[in-house]
From Swiss-Prot:
This is Large ribosomal subunit protein uL24. One of its GO terms (cellular component) is ribonucleoprotein complex. One of its GO terms (molecular function) is rRNA binding. The lineage of its organism: Bacteria, Pseudomonadati, Bacteroidota, Flavobacteriia, Flavobacteriales. Disulfide bonds: none annotated. SMART domains: KOW. It comes from the Bacteria. Keywords: Ribonucleoprotein, Ribosomal protein, RNA-binding, rRNA-binding. GO terms for biological process: translation. It comes from Flavobacterium psychrophilum (strain ATCC 49511 / DSM 21280 / CIP 103535 / JIP02/86).
């Protein structure tokens, strides 16, 4: 498992693939598979049978995971895609934007 620099709640932009240019909030990060679920990106149709949970059944749209390498964090200051660095401030590790050098 590698150290991921994208966390749940971050605003990211898709930089490669079918959904290139789309932006959204990270809902979930799967560290073992190096994938993230981004709100409103990579929507798939899931066919569900009627059950106690959903008596109607039918087709449900939901987000599918996307590779972490295909997303880039958006810098809150410049609103552009940026790389993320990690540095030690005091006795804590903090993430910072490589473009604006601002702590995230």
């Amino acid at each position: 498992m590698i150290k991921l620099k994208i966390k749940t709640g971050d605003i990211v932009r898709v930089i490669a693939g079918d959904h290139k240019g789309a932006e959204g909030k990270v809902v979930k990060v799967d560290r073992e598979k190096n994938k993230a679920i981004v709100e409103g990106v990579n929507m798939v149709s899931k066919h569900t049978k009627p059950s106690a949970k959903s008596p109607q059944g039918g087709i449900v749209k939901k987000e599918a995971p996307i590779q972490i390498s295909n997303v880039s964090l958006i810098d809150p200051k410049t609103k552009e895609a940026t790389r993320v660095g990690i540095r030690v401030e005091g006795d804590k590790k903090v993430r910072f934007s490589k473009k604006s050098n601002q702590v995230l």
